[in-house]
Amino acid sequence: MLRVIVLGAAAGGGVPQWNCGCPVCRAAFDDPRLARTQASLAISADNAHWFLINASPDLRQQIIATPQLHPRAGALRHSPIAGVILTNGEVDAVAGLLSMREGAPFSIYAHDKVLAILRANSIFNVLNESIVARRPVATDQPFEPLLPDGTPSGLEITAFEVPGKGAWYLEGRTHPGGDSQSGDTLGLTITDKSTGQSLHVLTACARVTDDLKARLAGAPLLLFDGTVWRDDELITAGLGTKTGQAMGHIAMAGDDGAIAALADLDIGQKLFVHINNSNPALLAHSAERGQLETAGWQIPADGTEVTL
């Protein structure tokens, strides 16, 4: 049985952001039930060994809030987390690795480009490579992530290129002009080898291409980039100077938005993740929430679990 837990559903900075008084953040400060941590997922084929999809800066808090990720009772050192699959090199995706430095064996799976980012930053040397293996992932080549003792996990994962962009903190250094390059942004197809059930994860996506539509069509579960409702919302709200497209994220709404682009693909459950604090769809009674729910989408709370 394939299980996925939404450890965190928010984009960078979480909800509320520490210094933000926008309507969504103000509501979350006033009612902590509205708060969401930064985007990360956990997946498992056996409900005993788990793989993280990205390691958010809130990872320690997310582990504490998720009993399935707690150390085994009676063990001095133990974690059911067998590995981390990174879909990009953004701070939001890699910073949580630093909270996993206490000597537990696991593997990091990522594109060569992201592994190079980790090698180039000596702070990640706290993850001793004799204990924490770094395993390159090639696109469009299925692989089975292994448990720390080398046994199969029961999962098959295929990474694929997604329209996006490079990490913000590398703009102008490795990405002249800010254009996306191979390995910058990956989507994942995750399959339970025993049942054949599969899901797709795209925590970042700049646009929906025909090839992407063909890949996602008929999927029982999709977790998709929900960063912004409108492309210009950060600008119009006075919260930033970039559009969603400039940040490598498609809008939910609009003729070219995710809701319209993915409307006719016969996808079972559709969840938005990586949702920015500027996005009014985070408010349960907003018109935007009503529109996306009418279109068959969900905004998950942290801790939401889906089983296939």
UniProtKB/Swiss-Prot annotation:
Keywords: PQQ biosynthesis, Transport. SUPFAM superfamilies: Metallo-hydrolase/oxidoreductase. May be involved in the transport of PQQ or its precursor to the periplasm. One of its GO terms (biological process) is pyrroloquinoline quinone biosynthetic process. Belongs to the PqqB family. HAMAP family: PQQ_syn_PqqB. Pathway: Cofactor biosynthesis; pyrroloquinoline quinone biosynthesis. It comes from Rhodopseudomonas palustris (strain TIE-1). This is Coenzyme PQQ synthesis protein B. NCBIfam families: PQQ_syn_pqqB. PANTHER family: COENZYME PQQ SYNTHESIS PROTEIN B, HYDROLASE C777.06C-RELATED-RELATED.
